[in-house]
Amino acid sequence: MNFALILMTNTLLALLLMIITFWLPQLNSYMEKTNPYECGFDPVSPARIPFSMKFFLVAITFLLFDLEIALLLPLPWALQTTNLPLMVMSSLLLIIILTLSLAYEWLQKGLDWTE
């Protein structure tokens, strides 16, 4: 009962906040508001320097692999089983999935910096 009440309250609060943001008036963005500000001086270099998409893809790949390894480390405690073959097989399955996804990224040149 408490979980359902908390879930319903959080859902209603999130919906209320979303509705309020859509009802609020959109502020006009003047040219002065969109320009970068450097202590009262004109900016020396452009404020929005584009970065390489390869860097973004490598960062996302790192986050995914880091998350999967974070799931792999507590696996023996999470399963809490006396069935050792089941734990070993599930760990090996996760490692095989990690290896196959790394090989796929490598073959698709997702980790290649030169182009």
Curated annotation (Swiss-Prot):
Catalytic function, reaction form: a ubiquinone + NADH + 5 H(+)(in) = a ubiquinol + NAD(+) + 4 H(+)(out)
GO molecular function terms attached to this record: NADH dehydrogenase (ubiquinone) activity
Family matches, as Gene3D superfamilies: NADH:ubiquinone/plastoquinone oxidoreductase, chain 3
Keyword Amino-acid biosynthesis: no
Transmembrane segments: 3-23, 55-75, 84-104
Highest taxon in the source lineage: Eukaryota
Keywords on record: Electron transport, Membrane, Mitochondrion, Mitochondrion inner membrane, NAD, Respiratory chain, Translocase, Transmembrane, Transmembrane helix, Transport, Ubiquinone
Source organism of the structure: Gorilla gorilla gorilla
Classification via InterPro entries: NADH_UbQ/plastoQ_OxRdtase_su3 (IPR000440), NDAH_ubi_oxred_su3_sf (IPR038430)
Membrane topology: Multi-pass membrane protein
Quaternary structure and partners: Core subunit of respiratory chain NADH dehydrogenase (Complex I) which is composed of 45 different subunits. Interacts with TMEM186. Interacts with TMEM242.
EC number: 7.1.1.2
Record flagged with keyword Iron: no
Protein name as catalogued: NADH-ubiquinone oxidoreductase chain 3
Pfam families (UniProt xref): Oxidored_q4
BP GO terms, sorted: mitochondrial electron transport, NADH to ubiquinone
